[in-house]
Amino acid sequence: AFADTKPQLEGEDRKLLNETMRDYRRAGLALPPAKRKEVEQLRKQLAKLGTEFGTNIANTKEPVVFTKAELDGMPEDFFTKPEIKTGDDAYTVLVNVTWQFVAVEENAKSEATRKRLYIAHDSLAKDKNVPLLNQMLTLRNKIALRLGYKSWDDFQTEPRMAKNGAAAQKYIDDLVAGIEPKFAAELTELQKMKQLDVQPQGGGAFTAPRINTWDWRYYQNQLKKQKFAVDTEALRNFF
């Protein structure tokens, strides 16, 4: 092969050769035929499971029915949409329809409503997909090991700036540490808003109520309205 002649290349030519040889190795071309075929089969299995995983989510229709009172805070035109109003004081939200899910999470005043919808959304196709996910993780590890990597993390990050999983994790850890003060300040603002909902009469010490995963969109949206006069629902009309 050309690479075996160890050509004296420089600059872009050297970079092109190195990256081409790396990609060949990542594809398994340096392996004996039997092991290369095994990696190819593992990759096909992984791709098939990935497609099945996404299809399961796309095909799962998870309707969650609320009363109008439970959806207090939603813009009035939400209730008039034919796909939403499905009965006498019955309003059906499909959690796999992104605009419906986000609209409720951003605007519904009731934490119980937001929580119920979020859990349904986070559980889409769970019974089918959790076993698939475990299989996919196993296949990823097998592929990485067959190709000579310590882990899937190292395999995935090799062609990127980080080069390995440990460096990528350090970057994330450093990033988290760097933004922590700003994050803490913004979180406190959301907590103050939630405390007003928990203790509407005010008074008492600041208790820093927990901002759950079904809370942040709502309080962030309220903060935008109060501080910047940004109405997310009104903006949707332009997109």
What name fits each language-model region?
Residues T86-L124, I211, D215-N221:
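Active-site-adjacent "gating/activation" loops or surface patches in catalytic cores
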Residues Y24-A27, L117-A120, Q226:
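Short, charged/polar, low-complexity loop and linker segments
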Residues E12, L16-N18, Q45-K48, T55, ...:
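Active-site-proximal, well-structured secondary-structure segments within enzyme catalytic domains
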Residues P7-K15, N107, N129-V130, I143-L145:
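A short, ordered amphipathic alpha-helix with a cationic face
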Residues P7, E12-L42, L46-F53, I57:
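Extended, charged alpha-helical coiled-coil/arm scaffolds that mediate oligomerization and mechanical coupling
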Residues A1-K6:
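Long, charged all-alpha helical bundle/coiled-coil segments in cytosolic proteins
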Residues G28-L42, D122-F155, K163-Q169:
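A conserved hydrophobic secondary-structure block that centers on an alpha-helix together
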